[in-house]
Amino acid sequence: MPQKDPCQKQACEIQKCLQANNYMESKCQAVIEELRKCCARYPKGRSLICSGFEKEEEEKQTLKCTPQ
């Protein structure tokens, strides 16, 4: 049986929040932050749900390292 994603609960909370708030992301910042905290607790690649945040962080690092 496949192992459950460790941050699935937080991802579901985001979906519930977005649905309850007409998909206004600004109203769900607290639950989004909880998912970020969950993702930070696990090694890269451990959570499929966190892969979007991991990609976002990689892009930020690339931009910081790119000479202007």
Swiss-Prot record:
Pfam families: CMC4 (PF08991)
Keywords: Disulfide bond, Mitochondrion
Motif (Cx9C motif 2): 28-38
Signal peptide positions on this chain: none
Keyword flag Disulfide bond: yes
Disulfide bonds: C7-C38, C17-C28, C39-C50
Top-rank lineage group of the source organism: Eukaryota
A single Gene Ontology CC term: mitochondrial intermembrane space
InterPro entries hit by this protein: CMC4 (IPR027179), Cys_alpha_HP_mot_SF (IPR009069)
Motif extent (Cx9C motif 1): 7-17
Subcellular location: Mitochondrion
Stretches assigned to the CHCH domain: 4-46
Family per similarity comment: Belongs to the CMC4 family.
Name the UniProt record assigns to this protein: Cx9C motif-containing protein 4
Organism: Bos taurus (Bovine)
